[in-house]
């Protein structure tokens, strides 16, 4: 099971207290929820304040929209909301309106199943309409009557819908593991944190209980990206390598480190390979292959290099998170690693690490493919490895 996200419900009417609590819990939570009472009392300004102070946190605005979905949600997405909620009981037209508003701002929608009689049917409809999150929610009044969300969570989880499941309703330290096992992708915590004597300590405890094994989480995320990557990439890239006179590789930042790793492995395989930017790298010519690693496909320095390589007649391969981009328009072949949705900040691995690590694994698989195809003995590869270290 992947690492669930922790969502903190900020329900205070006092904006100052809301910001203070957010600061205390920030190191341990992934999503700040501006609760319905808070957003009604403070208005859209609280969205802007939280987004300014915590730009790297996801921001959910619990609008509980009941009508006029697109019209109501649009200004909140424009102000910085990453997710807005719409009530499942509102009906398909209203949900579709919020989905439309979210799509216009590259954001997400959560459909709240609170008070929905047929939760399974509503969850299916939410997924069909394009919502990314379904919220299994037992409200405060229902909690007071002894109700919990756990049975409903398990039932919705068994549907296997292409959505993330959020659970809210009395979650605390004693129930975090239970809701995680029941299938929650997002665990919403309110009073267990904001009602604790030390909110930061409570948030850390819940974070630790939810996390489990970090190694398992990272492996699960990378496996998911590679599973959604076209398996023909290795063979297609190998064909490009085999048809080239020389190979030039490049990338910015961490992508550059991956490019250097790939260059070393190609050298082991007997290829004439160079890293762009090194003082000994020669000029690129027709018949050469230029491989650029850029997650966005828009990196300015990489774009300039790509244009020059195109002018000189080199063939170009882009490795990216996107199937279409400015650099991709210049490339002979674009190898998309995973899907764009897997690189949103909801994935739980910060600062873009998922792309770099996944690309590293894909390129290592390419090396394994070409070594097998060319029947290169490992002993021969070892003779090419650096011996001045």
Regions found by a protein language model. Give the residues of each.
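Conserved N-terminal beta1-alpha1 strand-loop-helix module at the mouth
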Residues: 1-70, 125-126, 200-201
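Hydrophobic faces of well-ordered beta-strands that scaffold small-molecule active sites
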Residues: 4-10, 32-34, 59-63, 84-86, ...
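Alpha-helix-loop-beta-strand connector modules within alpha/beta enzyme cores
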Residues: 40-64, 98-115, 147-173, 205-210
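Catalytic cores of alpha/beta
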Residues: 68-79, 117-129, 161, 171-189
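Glycine/Thr-rich beta-alpha phosphate-binding loop at enzyme active sites
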Residues: 122-155, 202
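A short, well-structured juxtamembrane/interface segment
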Residues: 227-243
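Glycine-rich phosphate-binding loops that contact phosphosugars or nucleotide phosphates
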Residues: 246-252, 257-361, 367-368
């Amino acid at each position: 099971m992947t690492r669930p996200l922790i969502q903190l419900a900020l329900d205070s009417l006092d904006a100052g207290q809301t910001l203070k609590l957010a600061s205390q819990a920030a190191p341990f939570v992934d999503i700040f929820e501006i609760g319905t009472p808070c957003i009604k009392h403070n208005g859209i300004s609280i969205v802007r304040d939280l987004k300014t102070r915590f730009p790297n946190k996801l921001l959910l605005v619990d609008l509980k929209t009941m009508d006029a979905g697109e019209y109501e949600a649009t200004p909140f997405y424009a102000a910085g909301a990453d997710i807005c909620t719409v009530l499942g009981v509102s009906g398909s037209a209203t949900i579709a309106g919020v989905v439309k508003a979210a799509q216009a701002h590259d954001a997400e929608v959560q459909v709240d199943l609170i008070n929905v009689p047929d939760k399974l049917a509503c969850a299916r409809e939410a997924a069909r309409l394009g919502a990314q999150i379904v919220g299994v929610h037992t409200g405060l009044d229902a909690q007071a009557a002894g109700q919990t969300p756990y049975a409903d969570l398990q039932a919705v989880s068994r549907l296997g819908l292409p959505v993330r499941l959020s659970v809210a309703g009395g979650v605390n330290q004693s129930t975090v593991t239970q809701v995680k096992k029941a299938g929650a992708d997002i665990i919403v915590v309110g009073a267990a944190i904001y009602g604790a004597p030390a909110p930061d300590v409570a948030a850390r405890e819940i974070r630790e209980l939810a996390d489990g094994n970090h190694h398992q989480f990272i492996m699960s995320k990378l496996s998911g990206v590679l599973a959604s990557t076209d398996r023909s990439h290795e063979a297609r890239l190998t064909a490009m390598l085999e048809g080239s006179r020389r190979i030039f590789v490049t990338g910015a930042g961490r992508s550059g480190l991956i490019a250097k790793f790939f260059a070393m492995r190609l050298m082991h395989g007997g290829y004439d390979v160079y890293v762009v930017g090194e003082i000994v790298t020669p000029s690129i010519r027709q018949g050469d292959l230029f491989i650029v690693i850029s997650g966005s496909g828009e990196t300015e320095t990489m774009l300039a290099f790509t244009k020059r390589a195109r002018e000189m007649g080199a063939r170009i391969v882009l490795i990216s998170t996107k199937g279409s981009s400015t650099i991709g328009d210049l490339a002979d072949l674009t190898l998309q690693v995973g899907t764009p949705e897997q690189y949103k900040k909801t994935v739980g691995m910060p600062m873009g690490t998922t792309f770099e690590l996944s690309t590293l694994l894909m390129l290592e698989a390419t090396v394994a493919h070409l070594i097998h195809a060319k029947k290169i003995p490992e002993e021969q590869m070892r003779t090419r490895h650096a011996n001045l270290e």
